[in-house]
Amino acid sequence: MAEAVLIDLFGLKLNSQNNCHQTLLKTLNAVQNHHADKAKFLCIICCGNISCERGGENDICELETSNGLLTLLKEFETVSKPSMAASLYTIKQKIDEKNLSSIKVIVPMHRKTLMKAFIDQLFTEVYNFEFEDLQVSLKDGLLKQSTEINMITAHELEEIQNEIETYLRSLPALNGELAIITTPSIPDIFIHGFTTRTGGISYIPTLSSFNLFSSSKRRDPKVVVQENLRRLANAAGFNAEKFHRIKPDHASEVWIMGKKEPESYDAITTNQRGVTVAALGADCIPIVFADPVKKACGVAHSGNLQTHSIISILRVSDCLTRQIPTLTSVKPPG
């Protein structure tokens, strides 16, 4: 049984105010009867006001004009945002606040593929989605669809990603401004530093707010981590496209950039200009190494099992880091 039920009315147009109410009443009644007892979150997604078509002109269909509908709507939360990205991200926050993971989405058939594309970007495998068709009659019926989307093209997917990225960039930093802790011990030919937990947009308590690691087992999606990384790159002055994290296995493997990348490694070393390497640290110690003579650097995270990793890195004059995160790179020429 779904813990949360979402009804997608985003962008729908209705052919009369009366039919608008009848359709919504039927759908909301069905949801309430089947899910109200067990679902902890019932939600309607819409874009501003729902518009009703009358004689070729658009009138605003105010939901509050129907007493029966108004009473029923009290059982639902309405999320009305100007974009689908904003709507779904707002809903995700509400779902995460309640620690829910089983979600039913009732969506018009022509919008199902579009909805799935947004969900794939904004949610992780922690969540379990099921989809149900919102019954929409297209011929002399109650609802009209403005555009049909049966398949997502590469261009449409790019537009979805751009919409999400634009929205995430507009979000304020949480828990304070972004901070990068540096040391005068490392010469300024290296961009280096340790980040803290402030300045990002991750709102999950255990990840808030500057999470730089995404996982299918976490609620923070890749797009949020990428936005945190973008903000870090802008603040520190490195190229986010040339950013490399360790892939820890709590062993002694070191990736020397330029050689074949191992499947997992607890340290990275490099002498390549313009490349940034980072180690993420939670309960392990992140370490940065910089050799101004060889112009090489490295990062690793070190716990009880990482002694061999540290020795290996010192031999190659590089760095270590882990999940706080630590970052370092050799500045590109110019």
Regions found by a protein language model. Give the residues of each.
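Phosphate/pyrophosphate-binding loops at sites that engage ATP/ADP/AMP, CoA/4′-phosphopantetheine
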Residues: H34-A39, K94-E97, A233-A236, L320-V330
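Acidic, glycine-enriched active-site microenvironments
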Residues: S170-N175, I180, I186-I191, G200
